[in-house]
From Swiss-Prot:
Protein name: NADH-ubiquinone oxidoreductase chain 3
Gene from which the chain derives: MT-ND3
Protein family according to the UniProt entry: Belongs to the complex I subunit 3 family.
Entry-linked Pfam families: Oxidored_q4
Spans traversing the lipid bilayer: 3-23, 52-72, 86-106
Catalytic activity: a ubiquinone + NADH + 5 H(+)(in) = a ubiquinol + NAD(+) + 4 H(+)(out)
Organism: Lycodon semicarinatus
Length: 114
């Protein structure tokens, strides 16, 4: 009996949500047509040039985001199989990323004004 009730409630909820979505009107207003937080015009040309500094910071963000993805499961893997190879690889990865960030900083790639 409970399974039938659950199926009926799911179908009723699906029908109600579909009906609400179908019959509500999409009215564009000034807030929906305005640029979002970034300040770019959403209806403008997609081929506008971007600054090199912005591009470099975006690439650095992606690299350090990838670093977090690679290093986040490390404590769990160290619990199952702690080895010197894992520690060496983590240390090498952090050293390479730190040296790259230091090089970028010394070259002035992180400066917004010139």
């Amino acid at each position: 009996m409970n399974l039938i009730t659950l199926i009926i409630m799911a179908m009723a909820m699906t029908t109600a949500l579909y009906t609400i979505n179908t019959y509500t009107t999409m009215k564009p207003d000034i807030n929906k047509l305005s640029p979002y937080e970034c300040g770019f015009d959403p209806l403008g040309n997609a081929r506008t040039p971007i600054s090199i500094q912005f591009f470099l910071v975006a690439i650095l963000f992606i690299l350090f985001d990838l670093e977090i993805v690679l290093l986040l499961p490390t404590p769990w893997s160290m619990n199952t199989n702690p080895s010197n190879t894992t520690i060496l690889l983590i240390t090498m990865l952090l050293t390479i990323l730190t040296l790259g960030l230091l090089y970028e900083w010394l070259q002035g790639g992180l400066e917004w004004t010139e």
